[in-house]
Each structure stands twice: as structure tokens, then as C-alpha cells.
């Protein structure tokens, strides 16, 4: 598993087509906020396997799975590309 500081650095360094993100470490994960609006974009929670993270999105008033099929877990780079590309993450941002 990548260290917390390494994960933070990789998130910040990612190319975000809708503007940058501010990354806040909290509650066993990383919350991504839009630097343009301050809105919540996504939450990435490391699961302890290699560099895999669970991807969550802000839904109504809580973090939830971004689909109808349960938790979405993927390697960090794939998760960053997923969040950057999918417009529903940016609805509140």
C-alpha cells in the first residue's frame, strides 16, 4: 500500500480537466474539493491492498457508492481517471 503522503501527492499531481482539487485527509480517506467552487468532488478511501481505493461520491447529504452495484474499488490511478472523467462527481462542484 502506498503511504498516505504518497497518495496525497499523486492526487494533487493528477491532471484535472475541470480545474484542480484541494485534498483533505480525514476519517481514513481523502476528500477532494473543487478549487473553483469549493464543492465536494469525491472521496477516496484506501482499502489496504496495494494502492487500491474505494471511490465514493457526495449523494444528497452523505458519501455513497457511485452506482447501483455496491462498492467501487480500483487502483488509485484508475480511480483518479474515473473521477476526472465522470461528470456526476462534479455536479456539486
In which residue ranges do the predicted regions lie?
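Short, conserved beta-strand/beta-arch hydrophobic-aromatic motifs that form part
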Residues: 33-57
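Amphipathic alpha-helical interface surfaces
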Residues: 7, 40, 75-76
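Mixed-charge, Lys/Arg-enriched low-complexity segments
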Residues: 1-3, 57-93
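Intrinsically disordered, low-complexity regions
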Residues: 20-21, 30, 39-40, 49, ...
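Negatively charged, low-complexity tracts enriched in Asp/Glu with abundant Ser/Thr
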Residues: 1-36
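Broad hydrophobic/π-residue packing in well-ordered secondary structure
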Residues: 21, 25, 30, 51-56, ...
